[in-house]
Amino acid sequence: MKYLSLFLLLVFSLSACTSDADNYATEAETAAAEPAGIAGNLDNPLGVQLWSFREKAQSGPEAMLAMVHDMGFRHVESAGMYDMTADEFAAAIKDAGLSVSSMHVSHDDLTNDMETVVANAKAVGAEYVGIAWYPREAGNFTEETARQAIADFNAFGKSLKDAGLKFFYHNHGYEPSPYGDGTLLDLIIDETDPELVTFEMDVLWTWLPNVDPVALIERHPGRFKLMHIKDMKPGLERGSLSGGLPEEDKSVIGEGQVDWPALLQAAEADGFEHYYLEDESTDPVGNAPKSVSYLTGITY
């Protein structure tokens, strides 16, 4: 009887090991079958800024997130949480098979409610937290405003770094007023602490005010870690510092003005970490896949 018991125990143990091995193999096969995301020739997969589909989200953010996954994206940059709590939004992101690598908040959020910003970022799993608009008088971005922004950004960066997060500023086209041998945007980049502040290059808002994005990267190596991939239609004039452009003037990537192969090559060489398609055209749902098709076909 003793030997029978030992035999049965051995059989049960072998069966359990085989079952565990089968389970691990199944999980590995599932992970391998799940696409890593859209990459093309980029070192890191292409993400999308969810602001692109804000109108789609009005009829249900869960359906919008599922659509984003179906387009091939696996990581996103958020801009709001659609009246959900951070935990609810994190669950919706997970259920859609997505992850949040970066999130946009407001200057007011960071000034008056840093604790909530940090809690929300950690709940959704974001590494980067940043702003895309600095409060100022309309049409008036001065040296005084730029220097106040520098102080704010360093303070925001310190608070977020202490919380294990990274702060960025996303340029928006009104900053490149001439200053010294450069612009006020150069001043902001030069005088913020690189240990505390990084930048997200919005290509449209770099291009529209007549700044060469490749030259900007080369002038400030290592300061840009994120990019918004966005363009304007051919034939439109550059030089505006308004920080705005009508939706109908925004272009499918590859059909606009920017030399994307040259820019992405420069960005990759400089060490950009995240790229987000942001489609603010009149038909983002229809145009985003066209932009993705172009971007994944780029070689350099």
Describe the predicted segments one by one.
Residues 75, 107-198, 285:
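Active-site acidic/histidine proton-transfer and metal-coordination neighborhood
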Residues 2-7:
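Sec-dependent signal peptide recognition
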Residues 48-52, 78-80, 102-107, 131-133, ...:
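A cross-domain feature marking catalytic cores of carbohydrate-active enzymes
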Residues 85-103, 149, 165, 286-296, ...:
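Short acidic, glycine/proline-enriched helix-loop-strand junctions
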Residues 18-47, 58-69, 125, 182-201, ...:
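Histidine-acidic metal/acid-base catalytic patches
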Residues 13-16:
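C-terminal motif of bacterial Sec signal peptides marking the signal peptidase cleavage site
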Residues 90-105, 153-156, 189-194, 260:
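Alpha-helix-loop-beta-strand connector modules within alpha/beta enzyme cores
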